[in-house]
């Protein structure tokens, strides 16, 4: 079996060090080498004369934090954090980049001084797993929103390739156009209900065709169709009902804006795949 690479970005905090420790069993499960990177924001060097000493001390801090990881898999660099993480991930041909989120109560603030998780995610060409929970990493169950697009199909296959043993639950939502206004316009409740039933039937038919065209193991992928918008609270609630810790999204079509909103609001771990 070929060995792949997982890259974890760390700011040397206790929280991010804990994420590295949690990434180790995931890397083992996926037969992947775990690399760790710390980027020193380049602007820091404008205030210091001895850049080499700072880099050396940061490298030593990495090695002290993670003595069980081979030194050649620990990287300390200077530069713009988002582009530097992305460049190293590309050079390593990483299949997954793992990031931590900071801030109280699941709020997403700066991951590093001068850079944000969103900036890093947008710079990547591979999936990013943003860790928001304090639990061990669990990717055996994934919740994925789908709009039945080709990009969505590609994303699902990408997740199946990355996590071949994962049980995937797809979620498709539909909305009744102008539902809050229809009664004001004199539309009877029975007619509104009939419209909703027709839209639901249409969505279920599209879901069945989409599942058929996935050419995947039906025991590993199922789908939920429900009325409503892509709301982070509802989405997180569905994840809770199904015992799912990790939500996975791609960033095109109707999912695009929702991806980063969900990243802000949910208390679940989130995989974002730039398509």
Regions found by a protein language model. Name each.
Residues 181-184, 202, 207:
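GTPase G-domain guanine-specificity segment
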Residues 86-136, 238-275:
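Gly/Ser-rich helix-loop-strand patches that form or flank binding pockets
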Residues 46-50, 109-112:
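Short, solvent-exposed loop/turn segments at secondary-structure boundaries
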Residues 35-37, 73-77, 129, 169-171, ...:
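General small-molecule cofactor/ligand-binding pocket signal
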Residues 54-60, 190-202:
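A short acidic, glycine-rich active-site loop
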Residues 1, 53, 66-99, 212-247, ...:
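Structural beta-alpha unit
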């Amino acid at each position: 079996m070929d060995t792949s690479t997982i890259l974890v970005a760390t700011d040397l905090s206790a929280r991010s060090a804990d994420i590295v420790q949690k990434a180790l069993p995931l890397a083992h499960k996926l037969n992947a080498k775990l690399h760790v990177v710390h980027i020193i924001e380049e602007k820091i060097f404008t205030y210091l004369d001895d850049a080499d000493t700072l880099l050396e001390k940061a490298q030593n801090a990495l090695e002290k934090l993670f003595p069980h990881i081979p030194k050649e898999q620990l990287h300390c660099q200077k530069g713009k954090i988002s582009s530097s993480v992305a460049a190293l991930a590309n050079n390593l041909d990483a299949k997954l980049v793992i990031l931590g989120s900071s801030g109280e109560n699941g709020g997403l603030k700066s991951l590093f001084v001068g850079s944000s998780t969103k900036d890093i995610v947008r710079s990547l060409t591979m999936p990013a797993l943003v860790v928001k929970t304090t639990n061990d990493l669990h990717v055996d169950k994934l919740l994925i929103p789908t709009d039945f697009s080709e990009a969505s199909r590609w994303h699902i296959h990408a997740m199946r390739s990355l996590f071949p043993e994962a049980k995937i639950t797809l979620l498709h939502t539909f909305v009744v156009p102008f539902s809050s206004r229809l009664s004001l316009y004199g539309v009877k409740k029975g007619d509104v209900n009939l419209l909703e039933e027709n839209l639901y039937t249409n969505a279920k038919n599209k879901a069945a065709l989409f599942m058929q065209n996935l050419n995947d193991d039906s025991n590993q992928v199922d789908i939920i169709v429900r009325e409503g918008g892509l709301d982070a609270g509802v989405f997180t609630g569905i994840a809770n009902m199904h015992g799912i810790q990790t939500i996975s999204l791609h960033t095109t079509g109707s999912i695009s804006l929702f991806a980063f909103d969900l990243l802000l609001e949910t208390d679940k771990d989130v995989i974002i795949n730039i398509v």
